Amino acid sequence: SYGMMIYKNDKTFRNLEIFGDSGSGAYLYDNKLEKWVLVGTTHGIASVNGDQLTWITKYNDKLVSELKDTYSHKINLNGNNVTIKNTDITLHQNNADTTGTQEKITKDKDIVFTNGGNVLFKDNLDFGSGGIIFDEGHEYNINGQGFTFKGAGIDIGKESIVNWNALYSSDDVLHKIGPGTLNVQKKQGANIKIGEGNVILNE
């Protein structure tokens, strides 16, 4: 469904939607939360009696949840080890190295890790538009064994620490978002962009 926002701005600084912004996020400042919040997606603009109207498609919680479920693969590590090779991901219960539950992962999907643990790359990985998401309040150890990772980036939850002992692909940029901490333990051949949280460079 469509909504409408009316902007009235008598200040010198003007930051309004213009033609070409369709599809971009529309934000409002929430005085109670004291931060900018997403209210929807910009659909179009019009001018009525000197006021600019911005038409938006309202944020839809149900649809967003369905999209996240469709384009993510959830793995509950629960302190255990997981190995990733090509499209296979194997969870080793009780930190066993040889046996485990194997699942298929799909390119262009996010992998969501929960409850802390260890991740071992056994191949050069290309997630396409997919990234790696780590939940809140846990520690994760990522070991690349000389293999590289390429994808949309890393999202680290609040009070989580990700010890990154892996290589990011040199033809990509490591994007790090989320309030958690990325502890980079290996010298990288790629650039890094930080959207939020902390990054520790140890080499």
Pin down the residues of each PLM region.
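Extracellular, surface-exposed repeat architectures
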Residues: 115-186, 203
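A short acidic/small-residue loop/turn micro-motif
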Residues: 46-47, 189-191, 203
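Acidic Gly/Asp/Thr-rich repetitive segments characteristic of extracellular carbohydrate-active
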Residues: 81-111
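Glycine- and acidic-residue-biased ligand/ion/polar-headgroup-sensing regions
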Residues: 87, 180, 194-199
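C-terminal subregion of chymotrypsin/trypsin-like serine protease catalytic domains
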Residues: 16-90
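Chymotrypsin/trypsin-fold serine protease catalytic domain
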Residues: 1-14
